[in-house]
Amino acid sequence: MRIESSIVNQIDELASDLNKTRSGLISIFITGGIEELVKQLQQRELPANDITTVDDDESNIRYFLLNTNYNNTPSDHFLMLKNGEAAAFYPGWKENIERLREGDIIFLYHSGHGICGYGSAGSKLNITDHQGDKNERYSRVLNNFVSNFKPITAKTCKDITKSNFNFRITMSRLTKEQGDAIVKKIKELMTA
């Protein structure tokens, strides 16, 4: 990574004043910057996180990409894979699990790795506690859950769907064409 010399000088002065190393401060700045950007993205997501649309036809299967929250809580990610379920936590996100219909196809996305499992939403909404917070975990079993394939990276997803979608938000709606392309790729990986 190249950093302008004027910025390096400022970092060195701060490092000296704070009795820290240059690389330590750079790491702090990067971490703080990432945290701030994540907060900004979450604020952008909140008003538009309703996964339903006005023209939804009750008879059509819908497709969704669910970020498993690995970067925040790895245990949530592993629990979803172990139990073959889709889950979300806390107001603003958990309601998306409630809005799923039986038969909707859910792809589980592991940040930095890719789509690592999928199945069709079951009919029963399960509401449980999350990390001591009452009723803050909404989940649904994913019927016919499959996870025994090499994860499909974000780049591969974009390539096979010929589209760009946001992997960072908790849950996003995919088009039928995007969903079909991902299912096709998973089936190819399982027979390879």
Locate each region found by the language model.
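Short alpha-helix capping/helix-loop boundary micro-motifs
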Residues: 88-96
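Short beta-strand-centered aromatic/proline hotspots
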Residues: 115-126
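Short, basic/aromatic beta-hairpin or loop at an interaction surface
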Residues: 72-87
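Short, well-ordered loop/turn sites that connect or cap secondary structure elements
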Residues: 99-101
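Contiguous surface segments at macromolecular interaction interfaces
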Residues: 2-10, 16, 20-63, 91, ...
